[in-house]
Amino acid sequence: MSKTIKVTQTKSSIGRLPKHILCLKGLGLRRINHTVEVEDTPCTRGMINKVYYMVKVEE
C-alpha cells in the first residue's frame, strides 16, 4: 500500500500565481482548511514544495 500524506490549505489562493493555483487544484484543495489525503510521490511532493507557504503537511 502506498504511503499517504495529509495536506491542508491554510491560506487563500486569491491573487496568487496561476501556476500555484493549478498546483492547489492538482492536489485537490478547494478552500481554506480543506484537507485531502494524497499519495506520497515525487510529483505530489513537487506540487507541495511549490505552494509550501499556503499548505500544512502531516506525514
Curated annotation (Swiss-Prot):
One function term, GO molecular function aspect: structural constituent of ribosome
GO cellular component assignments: cytosolic large ribosomal subunit
Keyword flag DNA damage: no
GO biological process, one term: translation
Coiled coil: none
Keyword line: Ribonucleoprotein, Ribosomal protein
Pfam families named among the record's database cross-references: Ribosomal_L30
Record CDD domains: Ribosomal_L30
Quaternary structure and partners: Part of the 50S ribosomal subunit.
PANTHER family: LARGE RIBOSOMAL SUBUNIT PROTEIN UL30M, MITOCHONDRIAL RIBOSOMAL PROTEIN L30
Similarity field: Belongs to the universal ribosomal protein uL30 family.
NCBIfam families: rpmD_bact
Protein name: Large ribosomal subunit protein uL30
Species annotation: Aliivibrio fischeri (strain ATCC 700601 / ES114)
